[in-house]
């Protein structure tokens, strides 16, 4: 758990600043972390992230809940995988389902060949993940982020996770509206 890892870092390196750097899925976990424990760190860098899409994540959670009830928690649904990741390769000519991950074809090949990357996740994962996205983007939770916590957002204009920059801009705007001073 992220809170445990950061606590361990602070113990191992007393007096040092702790800057949390998170990418893609980790950036969503880190958004949750800063809502709960933001005062424990000195800054956060969210890379390849996205902002509030409450309708999309809410509907996705309902669908994943139905699929989970019908087929089981531990099953892996091609439907859910397609609904979540299916459009990410739109406009990219490639045989790889993971072409969206990087512009460098050699890196995509390494990703495809790595058994720890690109695997299908369970119905329960999708249900929990989409519920988490809904939760982290509720105003009452986002408002718990310390207003003096420096937040640095990075996004690529070719990254479908952040809707090619649009959703990251929504996150920026949301944080500014909440009164976070250094975004």
Roles of regions detected by a PLM:
Residues 2-16:
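Conserved acidic catalytic loop of the alpha/beta-hydrolase fold
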Residues 21-26, 30:
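Gly/Ala-rich beta-loop-alpha elbow adjacent to hydrolase catalytic centers
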Residues 30-118:
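Alpha/beta-hydrolase-fold enzymes
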Residues 121-143:
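Active-site nucleophile elbow and catalytic-triad environment of alpha/beta-hydrolase enzymes
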Residues 145-151, 181:
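Short, proline-enriched alpha-helix->beta-strand connector loops that line the catalytic pocket
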Residues 153-155:
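Short beta-strand/loop motif that positions the catalytic acidic residue
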Residues 160-170:
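Conserved alpha/beta-hydrolase "acid-adjacent" motif
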Residues 172-183:
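Catalytic histidine neighborhood in serine/cysteine hydrolases
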């Amino acid at each position: 758990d992220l809170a445990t890892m950061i606590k361990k870092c602070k113990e191992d390196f007393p007096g040092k600043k702790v800057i949390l750097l998170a990418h893609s899925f980790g950036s969503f976990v880190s958004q949750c972390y800063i809502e709960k424990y933001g005062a424990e760190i000195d800054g956060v860098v969210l890379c390849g992230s996205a902002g509030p899409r409450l309708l999309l994540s809410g509907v996705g959670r309902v669908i994943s809940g139905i699929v989970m009830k019908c087929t089981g928690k531990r099953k892996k649904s091609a439907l859910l995988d397609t609904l979540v990741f299916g459009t990410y390769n739109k406009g990219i000519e490639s045989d790889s389902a993971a072409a969206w991950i990087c512009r460098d074809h050699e890196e995509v090949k390494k990703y495809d060949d790595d058994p720890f990357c690109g695997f299908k996740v369970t119905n329960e994962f999708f249900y929990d993940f989409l519920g988490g996205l809904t939760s982290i983007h509720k105003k009452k939770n986002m408002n718990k982020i310390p207003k003096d916590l420096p937040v640095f957002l990075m996004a690529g204009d070719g990254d479908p996770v952040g809707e090619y920059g649009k959703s990251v801009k929504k996150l920026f705007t949301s944080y500014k509206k909440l009164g976070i001073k250094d975004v």
